[in-house]
């Protein structure tokens, strides 16, 4: 019975044009990549500074692999926080002129962690409808009241703010809206 339901749902997704197929790249990490022997410029890369293939970074990663192995074997809060992590946080703090730095392994985790730290139950989060999924998930998981305003519609945002009775309001807007293509 379940297979029929899944097959039906997959068919609906395919017919709607929302069925995704992973493309197999023929190259490593770069803003340029090979796909079926043709070179493309990637607008979907997370390698924002084009450092993925920088020889200095690769050599530093090799040294870290030799020293620490492939995995920390645990989250940073349990027992996976290494001397290299600590040194990096200290160097970033010094570079930025800040007391402390907290590193997250992904932007998604950073958004979840920071939003949860800023709000509590009873607070309000008011967010743009086209925010990245990580901002939406972080808002929902924070357990604050969550409302969304129409994309880039600051009059709609103002209406929502005026209706909010909470002591603390957090307005969240993406800087580059990537979720709608």
What are these regions (language model features)?
Residues 50-51, 78-81, 133, 154, ...:
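Short, small-residue-enriched loops and turns at beta-alpha junctions
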Residues 59, 63-107:
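Conserved N-terminal alpha-helix of the aminotransferase class I/II PLP-enzyme fold
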Residues 121, 141-143:
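Short, structured coil segments at secondary-structure junctions
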Residues 2, 6-8, 12-70:
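N-terminal "arm"/small-domain region of PLP-dependent enzymes with the aminotransferase-like
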Residues 114-133:
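Conserved PLP-anchoring active-site segment centered on the Schiff-base-forming lysine
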Residues 147-181:
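Active-site phosphate-binding strand-loop segment of PLP-dependent enzymes
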Residues 42-44, 70-75, 169-175:
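Short beta-strands and strand-loop turn motifs
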């Amino acid at each position: 019975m379940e297979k029929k339901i899944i097959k039906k749902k997959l068919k609906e997704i395919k017919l709607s044009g929302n069925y995704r197929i992973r493309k197999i790249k023929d190259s490593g990490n770069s803003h340029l990549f090979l796909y079926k022997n043709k070179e493309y410029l990637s607008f979907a890369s997370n390698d924002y500074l084009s450092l993925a293939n920088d020889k200095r970074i690769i050599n530093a990663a090799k040294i870290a692999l030799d020293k620490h192995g492939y995995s920390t074997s645990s989250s940073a809060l349990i027992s996976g926080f290494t001397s290299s992590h600590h040194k990096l946080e200290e160097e970033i703090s010094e570079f930025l002129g800040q007391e402390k730095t907290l590193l997250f392994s992904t932007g998604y985790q950073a958004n979840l962690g920071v939003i949860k730290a800023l709000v509590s139950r009873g607070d309000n989060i008011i967010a743009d409808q086209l925010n990245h999924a990580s901002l939406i998930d972080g808002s929902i998981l924070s357990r604050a009241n969550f409302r969304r305003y129409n994309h880039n519609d600051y009059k709609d945002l103002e209406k929502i703010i005026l209706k909010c009775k909470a002591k603390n309001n957090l307005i969240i807007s993406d800087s580059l809206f990537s979720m709608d293509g």
